């Protein structure tokens, strides 16, 4: 029995259309809260044994074909507000990264690194997303979240365990808002910089394809800068190329010809196709270089039940 809600609670909701790769089976339940109070009350009343999975806009996610045995929580319009207060940019977890970058720039605040990062602020914080040498951790002050027990809390950035493409958020914790510190900048110059970033991205990445962004993390321990905190200069795409996996296919899944660290759904791919191709890339790269790539895309859920 699910607790009463003011938002939307749907049983057996197929998740494929909520992910950028357009794959995935059903969640036991999908909850879209009306606001933070609705989220707090729901989690406080939900059986503690029921797993909870916070889901952003599905930009960095493979949901397996068997679906998710959990309550998936997806934030919407009640969580996408953006406001500027001095040098602080406060964004709801459902606000798109690109929208936050543009709003900040219009106000003369520099969060331009967010402009070409796919997805929403909640996911960007959870993954410590970064681009052009800048990461969420470089700007984040604090987050607001609701714990699995239904308590609203403020968590300083220092307590989030932010590292390369990861964080240490408590299990079942749902981010609702993030506060960033942003340096001042000229709005016209910031807009020009973002246009350059977009042009660079569109010329080198398959932005018109169904993808989830970078598939694998750049390997740790290989630095060309000498900085102790910048040890990911060996690029995953280069290792994939050297292993002969650019353009490799499995079913409807393909490693992009345009950028070999992008896994794309060419049409009709299953989650098994996508994940299977990714695992084959990991195997082939290890055979070629002795380096084991790590997934950057999150993979969740169950394999489909074999009915034979």
Swiss-Prot record:
GO CC annotations, alphabetized: cytosol
Domain FAD-binding PCMH-type, first and last residues per copy: 22-185
Annotated compartments: Cytoplasm
Known role: Cell wall formation.
Biased composition (Polar residues): 212-226
Keyword Ion transport: no
SUPFAM superfamilies, per database record: FAD-binding/transporter-associated domain-like, Uridine diphospho-N-Acetylenolpyruvylglucosamine reductase, MurB, C-terminal domain
Alphabetical list of Gene3D superfamilies matching this protein: 3.30.465.10, UDP-N-acetylenolpyruvoylglucosamine reductase, C-terminal domain, Uridine Diphospho-n-acetylenolpyruvylglucosamine Reductase, domain 2
Record GO biological process: cell division; cell wall organization; peptidoglycan biosynthetic process; regulation of cell shape
One GO MF term attached to the UniProt entry: FAD binding
Similarity section: Belongs to the MurB family.
Required cofactor(s): FAD
Protein name from the UniProt record: UDP-N-acetylenolpyruvoylglucosamine reductase
Enzyme Commission number(s): 1.3.1.98
Major subcellular site: cytoplasm
Catalytic activity: UDP-N-acetyl-alpha-D-muramate + NADP(+) = UDP-N-acetyl-3-O-(1-carboxyvinyl)-alpha-D-glucosamine + NADPH + H(+)
NCBIfam families the UniProt entry points to: murB, PRK13905.1
Keyword terms, alphabetized: Cell cycle, Cell division, Cell shape, Cell wall biogenesis/degradation, Cytoplasm, FAD, Flavoprotein, NADP, Oxidoreductase, Peptidoglycan synthesis
Biased composition (Basic and acidic residues): 197-211
UniProt-listed InterPro entries: FAD-bd_PCMH, FAD-bd_PCMH-like_sf, FAD-bd_PCMH_sub1, FAD-bd_PCMH_sub2, MurB, MurB_C, MurB_C_sf, Oxid_FAD_bind_N
Active site (catalytic residues): 165, 214, 296
Region Disordered, annotated ranges: 197-228
UniProt pathway: Cell wall biogenesis; peptidoglycan biosynthesis
């Amino acid at each position: 029995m699910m607790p009463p809600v003011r938002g939307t609670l749907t049983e057996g909701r197929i998740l494929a259309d909520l992910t950028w790769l357009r794959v995935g089976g059903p969640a036991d339940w999908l909850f879209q809260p009306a606001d933070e109070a609705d989220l707090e009350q729901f989690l406080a009343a939900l059986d503690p044994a029921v797993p909870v999975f916070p889901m952003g806009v599905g930009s960095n996610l493979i949901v397996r074909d068997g679906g998710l045995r959990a309550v998936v929580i997806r934030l919407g319009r009640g969580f996408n507000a953006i406001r500027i207060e001095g040098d602080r940019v406060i964004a709801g977890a459902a606000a798109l990264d690109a929208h936050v970058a543009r709003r900040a720039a219009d106000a003369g605040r520099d969060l331009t690194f967010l402009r070409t990062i796919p997805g929403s602020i909640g996911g960007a914080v959870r993954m410590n997303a970064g681009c052009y040498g800048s990461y969420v951790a470089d700007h984040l002050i604090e987050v607001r979240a609701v714990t699995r027990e239904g308590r609203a809390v403020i968590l300083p950035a220092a307590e989030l365990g932010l590292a390369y493409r990861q964080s240490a958020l408590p299990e079942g914790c749902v981010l609702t808002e993030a506060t960033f510190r942003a340096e001042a900048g000229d709005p016209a110059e910031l807009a020009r910089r973002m246009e350059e970033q977009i042009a660079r991205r569109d010329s080198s990445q398959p932005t018109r394809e169904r993808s989830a962004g970078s598939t694998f993390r750049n390997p740790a321990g290989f630095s060309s800068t000498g900085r102790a905190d910048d040890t990911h200069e060996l690029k995953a795409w280069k290792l994939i190329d050297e292993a002969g996996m650019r353009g490799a296919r499995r079913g409807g899944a393909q490693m992009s010809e345009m950028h070999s660290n992008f896994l794309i759904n060419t049409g009709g791919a299953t989650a098994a196709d996508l994940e299977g191709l990714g695992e084959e890339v990991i195997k082939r790269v290890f055979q070629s270089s002795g380096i084991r790539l790590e997934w950057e895309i999150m993979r969740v859920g169950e394999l489909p039940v074999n009915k034979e």
